[in-house]
C-alpha cells in the first residue's frame, strides 16, 4: 500500500471520529457519524462531478461533452456549498502538468520533490509559465465569478454556513467542515503524486461544452 493510500484512509477515519465525537447531544455519536458520512457523500458527489468530470475530462481534456448551463451551475454549486476549486486556475495548472510532467514547468511537482514538498505544493503550487486556459466558457459571468479572489474568500463562509444551517451547532459544523476540507486536500495530493495519465495539452484548447 502506497503512502497516499494510507493518508487517504487516515483522513476518512479522522472524519468519522470527528463526526462522532463532536456530535451534539440530540444526535449522539451514532447520529453524528451518520450525518458526517452523509455530508461527506454530498461533497464526494458534487466535487467528484465537478473536478474530475467537468474540469478534468470536460474542459481540460475535451474528452466529455456537457451542456454549458450544467457546467456553470455545477461550478457555482460546488464552489459555494462544497469545496472551492478555482476553475480557470485549475485547468491552467492541469494543462501545464500534462505538458511538463515532473519537470520544469509543471506547477504540481518536480521529479525531485518529495513527500512534504508535494504536500506543500497542493496549497502553494509553482507558478504557471503560460495561460493555457483561454476557453470561451471562462469568459462567461459564472466562471469569471467562480475564478475571482473575492468569491474564493466568500465561499469559505458560505460552505461553512451550509453545514451550520443543517446541524445548528457551530462546533460540530466546524468539525465537519474542516475534516472534509482536509480530506479534499488529501485527495488532491493523491491525484498530484499518482501516475500521470494522458498526453500533453496544447495552449489554445477550446472547451467541450455545448450550448
Per-region residue spans from a language model:
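Non-catalytic, topology-defining segments of multipass membrane proteins
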Residues: 1-186
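Active-site-proximal inter-transmembrane loops
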Residues: 82, 138-142, 200-211
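Low-complexity basic/metal-binding stretches
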Residues: 179-191, 195, 200-202, 211
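Short low-polarity hydrophobic stretches
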Residues: 174-175, 192, 206
Amino acid at each position: 500500500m502506497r503512502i497516499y493510500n494510507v493518508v487517504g484512509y487516515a483522513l476518512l477515519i479522522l472524519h468519522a471520529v470527528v463526526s462522532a465525537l463532536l456530535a451534539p447531544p440530540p444526535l449522539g455519536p451514532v447520529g453524528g457519524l451518520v450525518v458526517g458520512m452523509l455530508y461527506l457523500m454530498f461533497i464526494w458527489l458534487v466535487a467528484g462531478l465537478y473536478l474530475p468530470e467537468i474540469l478534468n475530462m470536460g474542459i481540460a481534456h475535451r474528452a466529455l461533452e456537457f451542456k454549458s448551463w450544467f457546467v456553470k451551475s455545477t461550478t457555482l454549486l460546488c464552489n459555494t456549498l462544497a469545496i472551492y476549486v478555482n476553475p480557470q486556475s485549475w485547468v491552467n495548472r492541469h494543462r501545464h502538468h500534462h505538458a511538463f510532467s515532473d519537470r520544469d514547468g509543471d506547477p504540481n511537482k518536480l521529479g525531485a520533490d518529495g513527500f512534504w514538498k508535494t504536500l506543500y505544493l497542493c496549497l502553494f503550487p509553482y507558478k504557471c509559465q503560460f495561460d493555457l486556459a483561454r476557453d470561451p466558457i471562462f469568459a462567461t459571468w459564472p466562471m469569471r465569478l467562480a475564478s475571482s479572489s473575492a468569491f474564493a474568500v466568500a465561499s469559505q463562509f458560505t460552505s461553512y454556513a451550509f453545514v451550520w444551517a443543517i446541524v445548528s451547532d457551530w462546533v460540530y459544523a466546524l468539525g465537519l467542515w474542516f475534516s472534509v476540507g482536509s480530506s479534499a486536500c488529501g485527495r488532491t495530493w493523491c491525484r498530484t503524486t499518482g501516475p500521470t495519465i494522458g498526453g500533453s495539452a496544447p495552449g489554445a484548447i477550446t472547451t467541450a461544452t455545448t450550448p
